[in-house]
Amino acid sequence: MRATPGRRSFLATCGLAAAAMARPLAAYGQAVDNARQASRPSQLQITDIKCAYVRGSLFVKIHTNQGIWGCGEGVDAVGGTYHLVQTLGNRIRGQNPLNVHRLFEQLRKGSIFGGAQAGMFVAVLTAVETALWDLAGKALNVPVYQLLGGKFRDKIRVYLDTALYQTRLPTPDQFAAAASKAVKDGYTAIKFDLDQAADPNKYDSFNWTASPAEVQRMVDQLSAARQAVGPNVDICADMHGRYDYPTALQVARRLEPLNLMWLEEPIPAENIDAYKLIADATSTPICAGENVYLAHGFRGLLEKGALDIIMPDLQKTGGLGEGQRIANLAHLYYVPFAPHMVASFLGAMASSHVCASVPNFLILEWQTY
């Protein structure tokens, strides 16, 4: 085809625009390459650590003497953790950030009497540890999964958390519609919340026992979702640890015909024996772990066979190295690893490196809200 003058000028304009856009991208890429080439790993030192609290997550950025930096995220770390981040930063300033396990153990062991076993401290430590892995990958010019020992897979399967947790009680039809939309969008697994705060059939806000009508509502909602998508889509249900043993057992048994992928946190995380009783009494797989911290926290659950699937949150349980330890511990008991994930895209990508690096990975949570 012969180009007309108008067509020539249009193509020329497009070419100039593309070149103009390519220049800054090329410059950025060159800057990254220069930083990597200039990296002297054995001489790296931590010079500063900064943090910000954005949309419910703590973000930590670690700086070095070579201009290389790393970012990490911690969830459920609360907004007033600035001073804790600075305290941890002061302890590792001047050290080589590539010694990730050593620095993690130094910070954890140095705060045993200050809450280093669980909760907010571990969530903050998680953000710091993840930032160290990010920094190490940049300094050595390799993906973090490579630093964790390499990958078992090239793709990470995710399920969609439908987030039907509203001020108004979702109907079974809304569950069905959400399930159908998720499948249409390409998901092969979906999750629904069953602990609906707006349910008028609750006994009261402090009662952990569900009323018969509340249990029936849960069954009706999930039955509608299953009917909408058929038998070949995985469906998960989350109770957020807000019920007691009798309710959990009743719900698990009532849901058996729906062939769920799992029932998540039907009771609070603390009582291992109660989880064992539920898991032994139903064919519905029982899953928990988002409120369990460090590999030590999962040891008892696995030793007693209290869970069918473990679900650590890699942005609060201790970080990527600790997450891999938890997965490998579960692998010894032939228990699948399905990480909880309510973090930002940064946390999601960090979790994906661990998911790639362990053999017993099942599926990762994905948020769209």
Regions found by a protein language model. Name each.
Residues 24-56, 60-62, 69:
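C-terminal segment of N-terminal export signals and the immediately downstream linker at the start
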Residues 1-18:
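N-terminal secretory signal peptides and thylakoid transit peptides that target proteins
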Residues 143, 157, 234, 285, ...:
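Proline-centered loop/turn at the N-terminus of a beta-strand
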Residues 155, 160-276:
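Metal-dependent enolase-superfamily TIM-barrel catalytic cores that perform enediolate-based chemistry
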Residues 65, 69-140:
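Metal- or metallocofactor-binding catalytic centers and their adjacent structured scaffolds
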Residues 129-161, 165-167, 188:
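Glycine-rich, aromatic-flanked loop segments that form ligand/cofactor-binding clefts
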Residues 82-83, 90, 95, 102, ...:
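Shared catalytic-loop signature of beta/alpha-barrel
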Residues 67, 128, 141, 190, ...:
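Conserved, mostly hydrophobic/aromatic
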